[in-house]
Amino acid sequence: EQTSLVVMDVGAAEPHIHHQGRAERPAVNVSRLLLLRSYAEAVAQGQLAPERRVALADVQRYHLKARGQGGHPAAIERLRGEGAITEDSLTIAALVRSMTQYNDEAAADWLLATLGYPAVDATREALGWPARATPLPSSGRTLSWRHPRMDATPAERLTVLTAQPRSAYAQEVLDLTGAFTASGSFRDEVLTLVQERGTEISLRDQRALAQATYPTACATEYAAFLTALLQDSLGSPAVSARMRSALERTVGADTLGGPLPVEAIGSVSGAFPGLISFAAYARRPDPLPDRIVVSFIQDLPIAVFYHMMQTGMDRALFVRLLSDDAYVEDTARFLAERETGG
């Protein structure tokens, strides 16, 4: 069994569902919530100004055209359509929203570099989470699997990376990110390789390398994190409010074919072959309590993974868990029967 699922209402004594919630699993994008927390703290302390404008070219240097790196172009197109990009620049606040709402991996890498890895790692450490929970630059992580100056095969890299201490791996990824974003021969070689031949790593090897190197996450811990965020107890109320403003989106009346008892959803999610990750809360109208859903799935068969991606089955499942009380009860009953062999 390779699925963690926690469904809970804010203020409730017990969760509706707590299925393998304490398992540590590799997760896609969800660790950006730690980045968001560090950003909100930096703003509150006067270290970063949300209205400061950033050259789009500075952000695009972090974009690597490889699997798991496709969110940035679509995000930029949406930001242009919204008028958030003028004279080829945008505010830090818009970049943060692009990271959280549009899955912009280049924006996430830029923000991590701007805040500094030590600051984000300190946020993780203050929560008492394991070292592997800290996000790393996605561009450098992908290059740690394979780059033009590497002789090792993907299988050999997997052996090395599995045994490597997290601190050493983090430094390697940060160094690769720095080399890639700087002007020079290494960047030119990487861009040429990716343009001509891709990453030269099979889908099966990419899946194994991702599970070995992505940040880990615990559904129970992220559910507690989101609970604190909704209760204004994640840092100061101002920090919590800034985080929510970057996360929340209103819900259309036609979602899942009909109106939902939900006013807004704040979520971070991601997928990579074999992995699906989702951490979200729903603000619901009184007297309904706000709801939290966190799920991490790993080792999905590739055929099943792509079927879920093509049909949107995963998204529909999570939205129903956020909004449909009867569906939550049915899911809880089904999981309980499975656990007892019923």
Predicted regions mapped to residue ranges:
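Structured C-terminal helix/loop/strand segments within mature extracytoplasmic catalytic/sensor domains
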Residues: E1, E172-D175, A179-G342
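Short, charge-rich amphipathic segments
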Residues: P26-V28, A49-V59, P148-Q164, V173-F180, ...
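Mid-domain, small-residue-enriched loop/turn segments at the edges of structured enzyme/sensor domains
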Residues: Q2-T3, D88-I92, V96-L226
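Short, surface-exposed, charge-dense and proline/glycine-enriched linear segments
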Residues: V30-Y39, E77-S89, P137-R157, L161-D175, ...
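Active-site-adjacent loops and short helices of periplasmic peptidoglycan-processing enzymes
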Residues: E1-H147
